Amino acid sequence: RLKDAARRLEICRNALKNRDFETFAEIIEIDSNMMHAIMMTSNPSIMYWQPTSIKIMQTVRALRQKGTAAAFTLDAGSNVHVICEGNTVNKIEALLREISGVKEVIKSSVGSGAKFVESA
């Protein structure tokens, strides 16, 4: 995973620059899955994925196969983060809320950017 990280990062950067959501989605999902595969195959094993996590991942992939730009990544836990375009947020939120086991859907968006703050 680490030996290939720079290559995947470059692919991700190019995908963002070229607005190639499909490639971006594939790379971030692969990277997330690889991180979790390492945890699952370590000794002792750590298994964060829950049935609801897997259902969300399947739902996101199905959406993308039908043409909706959506991708998932997971933190070092069972929390699935869905990345999508702004015009699909409400549709995806509604679908996620229908999944049994989903406790909360938190919407976020791109911020205004970094700002320099003078210390007091």
Features from the language model and the residues they span:
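C-terminal nucleotide
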Residues: 1-120
